């Protein structure tokens, strides 16, 4: 039995690939200058002490107004929190060619990430100071393909149920024309959290 050698993958791009009309069509939106709401936002993570000292709605509002940094994943994934009310959160996102899957659409994981973020933050917005939470279940339904040409999308989430130990929320992802792209639901466990 041979030993697997981890050799670097060599990708050869032919002239045919470089001038494929489908490739050019997919990459064309990259040249547009659409921007998210706040391109100068701070990125980072606050200490657990700060996180647990504030109720969820106040903490998330701090991310909106710059008092707290936005989570690093949101920068990596080109998504941004833009609205917070207790039990309701809105994100926007920019699906670009860097998130393409092999068949030329935006990978479903990108849509799942923006939905997960919005649905989880929706639950976070209901937390009391000293409470923590974690996602224990998530379900996503994909309705239409997301493409780089889709442009900036909007993800709206709302709280469905908030108990003392679990909460459920749902989210919907729309294109700029209001067409539904994907929707999902999420269950989070709520627990007393410690600062250490």
Tell where the protein language model's regions lie, with residue ranges.
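Terminal targeting signals and extreme-terminal segments of soluble enzymes
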Residues: 2-196
């Amino acid at each position: 039995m041979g030993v697997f050698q981890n050799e670097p993958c060599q990708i050869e791009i032919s002239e045919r690939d470089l001038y494929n009309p489908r490739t050019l069509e997919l990459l064309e939106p990259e040249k547009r200058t659409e921007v998210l709401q706040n391109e100068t936002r701070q990125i980072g993570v606050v200490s657990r002490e700060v996180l647990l000292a504030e109720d969820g709605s106040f903490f998330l509002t701090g991310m909106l107004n710059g008092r707290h940094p936005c989570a690093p994943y949101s920068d990596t994934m080109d998504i941004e929190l833009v609205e917070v009310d207790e039990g309701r959160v809105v994100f926007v996102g920019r699906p670009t060619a860097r998130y393409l899957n092999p068949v030329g659409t935006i990978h479903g994981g990108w849509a799942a990430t923006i939905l997960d973020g919005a649905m989880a933050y929706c639950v976070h917005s209901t937390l009391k100071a000293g409470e923590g939470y974690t996602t224990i279940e998530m379900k996503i339904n994909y309705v239409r393909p997301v493409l780089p040409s889709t442009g900036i999308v909007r993800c709206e989430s709302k709280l469905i149920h908030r108990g003392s130990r679990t909460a459920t929320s749902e989210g919907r992802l729309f294109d700029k024309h209001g067409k539904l792209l994907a929707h999902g639901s999420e269950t989070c466990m709520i627990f007393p959290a410690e600062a250490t």
